[in-house]
Design a protein with these regions (language model features):
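C-terminal membrane-cytosol helix-exit motif in multi-pass small-molecule transporters
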Residues: 1-16, 195
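Juxtamembrane intracellular "pre-TM" segments in multi-pass secondary transporters
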Residues: 9-35
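A late C-terminal transmembrane helix in Major Facilitator Superfamily
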Residues: 145-181
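Extracytoplasmic gate region of multi-pass secondary transporters
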Residues: 30-82
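Helix-to-loop junctions at the C-terminal end of transmembrane segments
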Residues: 81-93, 176-177
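Structural signature of the two symmetry-related core transmembrane helices
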Residues: 96-111
Length: 195
């Protein structure tokens, strides 16, 4: 924050006219209904890998240290993916990047479930890079559709995302209790392909 402040403090601020909220209402359903459906399916992979990964690792015999490190590895790679995916989507298109992210991360999750121990860290790095990189692309997609009301569009998206994440977290947890985390992770990877 300090670096941004120091670099941007001398840039003049141009206030644009605020957009009308009435202009945003007709755009809500055509964008957010399909986005909510895709996000719901996509959340299965994201929730499985971020919320339940350490528990999954412990159930499969990993040490407590390795279980915690696996989440750190995934999240660390996700930061790099998030930083790169926004720029890539500007050049290659939002939908194509989201398609590739979804397919690659789902296949990598399946590979993670059935890989040898020595392959876990490389797979987690690539999986984190791909699976956690969709958020900036989705935010950019929302901003593309609401150029005059970006804050409202982002607020609707983030609220929807938080609510869906909470719901999917419960569903994956209940599935993990009922059929085991291995099966819940497997089905989460397949369900995320529906996005």
């Amino acid at each position: 924050s300090l670096i941004l402040f120091l670099r941007l403090r001398d840039i003049p601020v141009n206030m644009r006219a605020k957009g009308s909220l009435q202009s945003i209402v007709p755009k809500i359903r055509p964008l957010f209904l399909p986005l909510a459906i895709a996000l719901f399916f996509r959340m299965f992979l994201a929730v499985s890998m971020t919320t339940y990964l350490p528990i999954y690792m412990r159930f499969n015999g990993a040490s407590l240290w390795m279980a915690g490190a696996s989440l750190s590895i995934l999240e660390f790679a996700g930061v790099a993916g998030a930083l790169m995916s926004g720029s890539l989507s500007d050049r290659l298109g939002r939908k194509s990047i989201l398609l590739w992210i979804t397919v690659i991360s789902s296949l990598l999750m399946l590979a993670f479930l059935y890989s040898a121990d020595w392959m876990l860290i490389p797979i987690l790095l690539i999986l984190g890079f791909t699976s956690l990189s969709s958020a900036p692309v989705l935010l950019a997609l929302v901003q593309d559709h609401f150029p005059d009301n970006r804050a409202v569009g982002n607020g609707i998206y983030l609220t929807m995302s938080s609510l869906l994440r909470s719901l999917v977290m419960l569903l994956v947890g209940m599935a993990g209790d009922a059929i085991g985390l291995q099966s819940a992770f497997f089905w989460s990877a397949l369900i995320s392909l529906l996005a």
